[in-house]
Amino acid sequence: MAVIRQLPDRLINQIAAGEVVERPASALKELVENALDAGAQQISITLRRGGIDEITVIDDGSGMTPDDMALAIERHATSKLPDDSLDNIHSLGFRGEALPSIGAVSRLSLTSITAGFDHAWRLVVDGGVVSGPEPAALAKGSMISVTQLFKAVPARLKFLKTERTEQGQCADIVRRL
């Protein structure tokens, strides 16, 4: 009989990420929703190989402080719930799962600047391992780059479609937002 054991946090995060990040389009959706929730008026999106190799979202939203950036990559941390109730949600996202889930299965680079700071800060999550924040350059808002999607769970890559199909699904997500 198999012995029951507690899973390590890294594996728990990778499993949870599968609920949020199924393919490049789902990662892109989460990033664009975050930009919109931050009040962005302009959002630039770059995809390489249908988002499999890279997804970069640059926005002119409110940005984040280094402390908020560190919290944003923790599971269940959010700025979008005004109190302890789910009755008063006015944002696209609120669960605090997107960034930690993406960071658990890829390389996530988060660069942001907000009012009161003379330079931006960059924080990197590589397969769940955090480095930073460190000083960076960015004029306004946030830039989030996701590279090597599913590097921590390569079996997920087998379920992706062609680059063209993944690119089309990313375009569909953006049109719907």
Locate predicted features.
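N-terminal phosphate-binding caps/lids of nucleotide- and nucleic-acid-binding domains
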Residues: 1-177
